[in-house]
Amino acid sequence: MRPLNVQIRLGNLRHNYRILKEMHGGKLLAVVKADAYGHGAVRCAFALADLADGFAVATIDEGIRLRESGITHPIVLLEGVFEASEYEAVEQYSLWPAVGNQWQLEALLIRHWKKTVKVWLKMDSGMHRTGFFPHDYASAYAALKQSEYVDSIVKFSHFSCADEPESGMTEIQMEAFDLGTEGLEGEESLANSAAILNVPEARRDWGRAGLALYGISPFGGGDDRLKPVMRLSTRIFGERVLQPHSPIGYGATFYTSKSTRVGLIACGYADGYPRRAPSNSPVAVDGKLTRVIGRVSMDMMTIELDASQEGLGHEVELWGDTVNINTVAEAAGTIPYELMCNIKRAKFTYIE
């Protein structure tokens, strides 16, 4: 069997939730959209079932999957519905929909609901994706408030640069949000992972923990308070010694400078490892750091082995405990979200 493995450490997930909940105060949503960032939404949700105040997903299907698996917690639909008919499933599965534009608002208001619904009303405080502009927000709020079908309203927005503390954008967005919601009663939600960790003023009634929930710092590098949940590993299935000036891999992008011992490992871009990861991207053999050399192939890649490192059959960590996923992402010119969400053809093992 091909030895590409993903370990999901559910104990680390629970640890991270507790840390983030303590930092934020109030209530905390565990964001499990995109199959919990590649970790497995149902397994992660059940691991957090006795801790989490609620969960957040992106699509109706993600919410339904949690409900049908037995999750009874509040589930926020962060993008709302994509067509008016989806409000039927919102009601059937007791989801809390976000409303971030005029047609979503109107479709909700004209529908005859059999039971009341809790709405998350989104403001565009400066990111300019979805949400009502600050000057339109009060009127959208008032329309919902007047509806007999709306149980309560959570006012929320999303930060564009909370992971860039020196940008000043988070302060600008908080000011816009506070001005646009002035005098409007109800709960609020502003803090994503970066704001939970670094912006106390953004910690309102509800936090939304995404990346940090999975043990990854949104600021790059590591964070000693968090424990990585995902560990991706494989094994060396071939090794050889190459002479000086030997090219390696497609495109001959790397030449050995001396006699070099190399290992072939079972992971490539078809498995989700980024093809654009350059030579020198870190991996670890039995806990000792080394590097990728040559171009990443579809099903395999080459790593350098020194004289002290074990070879054939030994484990190689691609990211997890020794290799920080942020380092891999930075080398490949991408972000850890993309790496985790792209994993395929691997065996998943869940460790309590």
Curated annotation (Swiss-Prot):
Pathway membership, UniProt: Amino-acid biosynthesis; D-alanine biosynthesis; D-alanine from L-alanine: step 1/1
Cofactor section: pyridoxal 5'-phosphate
PROSITE patterns per the UniProt record, alphabetical: ALANINE_RACEMASE (PS00395)
Source taxon at top rank: Bacteria
Pfam families hit by this protein: Ala_racemase_C, Ala_racemase_N
Top EC category: isomerase
InterPro entries recorded: Ala_racemase, Ala_racemase/Decarboxylase_C, Ala_racemase_C, Ala_racemase_N, Ala_racemase_pyridoxalP-BS, PLP-binding_barrel
Positions annotated to bind substrate: 129, 298
CDD domains: PLPDE_III_AR_proteobact (cd06827)
A biological process from GO: D-alanine biosynthetic process
Residue numbers bearing the N6-(pyridoxal phosphate)lysine modification: 33
Cellular component terms (Gene Ontology): cytosol
Keywords: Isomerase, Pyridoxal phosphate
Known EC number: 5.1.1.1
Reactions catalysed: L-alanine = D-alanine
GO molecular function, one term: pyridoxal phosphate binding
Active site: 33, 250
Functional summary from the UniProt entry: Catalyzes the interconversion of L-alanine and D-alanine. May also act on other amino acids.
HAMAP family, sorted: Ala_racemase
Family: Belongs to the alanine racemase family.
UniProt name for this protein: Alanine racemase
Species name: Neisseria meningitidis serogroup B (strain ATCC BAA-335 / MC58)
